[in-house]
């Protein structure tokens, strides 16, 4: 079985999870519809102002609602930043390999922008493969966000890199940035090498 064949569809996994949780996402509404709703409710108006800010965001129809700009592996002991640019050539990322020293603690940081409408239930999903077999699946709930000019930043909880002779080697990751409506905001692939030392 090839690595491609071994990779399940994200939608199938999410459907299974949603049915177990009996979760039904709310219907999607545009930013304008949300702003028009409950105008007479002072507390809701205040909440929406807090979420959306004072300045209306210009909705450029050519820009996607959610733009994922970069992913970083945050580790205090790393000799330099470990960052991948997600606005350029995603195919090139498949040829690069990022390095983590075995056993170190690190966090995944994702930078993204919401450009037009409020997006509900953003999540980051990562499938990890080794020699074509899936060895891990992680799902991180990112949350709901309104549009604004500045980027948002999401940090996962602290994780520990695998360690030991058997854990060292190269892992292939398939990452998804999606939401409650199963909108695929970005899917990309990248490689991570677990080594005995940073400079090995």
UniProtKB/Swiss-Prot annotation:
Biased composition (Basic and acidic residues): 30-39
Gene3D superfamilies (alphabetical): Coagulation Factor XIII, subunit A, domain 1 (2.70.50.30)
GO molecular function: GTPase activator activity; GTPase activity; Rho GDP-dissociation inhibitor activity; small GTPase binding
Location(s) in or outside the cell: Cytoplasm, Cytosol
Keywords, comma-separated and alphabetical: Acetylation, Cytoplasm, GTPase activation, Phosphoprotein
Gene Ontology CC entries for this record: cytosol
Stretches for region Disordered: 1-39
Gene Ontology biological process terms in this record: negative regulation of trophoblast cell migration; regulation of Rho protein signal transduction; Rho protein signal transduction
Residues recorded with modification N6-acetyllysine: 20, 24, 39, 46, 101, 123, 174
Family statement drawn from the similarity comment of this UniProt entry: Belongs to the Rho GDI family.
Functional note: Regulates the GDP/GTP exchange reaction of the Rho proteins by inhibiting the dissociation of GDP from them, and the subsequent binding of GTP to them. Regulates reorganization of the actin cytoskeleton mediated by Rho family members.
Assembly notes: Interacts with RHOA. Interacts with RAC1. Interacts with RAC2. Interacts with CDC42.
Protein name: Rho GDP-dissociation inhibitor 2
């Amino acid at each position: 079985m090839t690595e491609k064949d071994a990779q399940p569809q994200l939608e199938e996994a999410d459907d299974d999870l949603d049915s177990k949780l009996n979760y039904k996402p709310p219907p999607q509404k545009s930013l304008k519809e949300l702003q028009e709703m409950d105008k007479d409710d002072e507390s809701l108006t205040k909440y929406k102002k807090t979420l959306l800010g004072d300045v209306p965001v210009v909705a450029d129809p050519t820009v996607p609602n959610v733009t994922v700009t970069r992913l970083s592996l945050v580790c205090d002991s790393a000799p330099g930043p470990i960052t991948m640019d997600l606005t350029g050539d995603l195919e090139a990322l498949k040829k690069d390999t990022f390095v983590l020293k075995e056993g170190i603690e690190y966090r995944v940081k994702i930078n993204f922008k919401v450009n037009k409408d409020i997006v509900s239930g953003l999540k980051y999903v990562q499938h990890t493969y080794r020699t074509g077999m899936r060895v891990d699946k992680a799902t991180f709930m990112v949350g709901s966000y309104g549009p604004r000019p500045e980027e948002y930043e999401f940090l996962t909880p602290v994780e520990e890199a695998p360690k030991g002779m058997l854990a060292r080697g190269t892992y292939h990751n398939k990452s998804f940035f999606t939401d409650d409506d199963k909108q695929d905001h970005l899917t990309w692939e990248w490689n991570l090498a677990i080594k005995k030392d940073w400079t090995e």
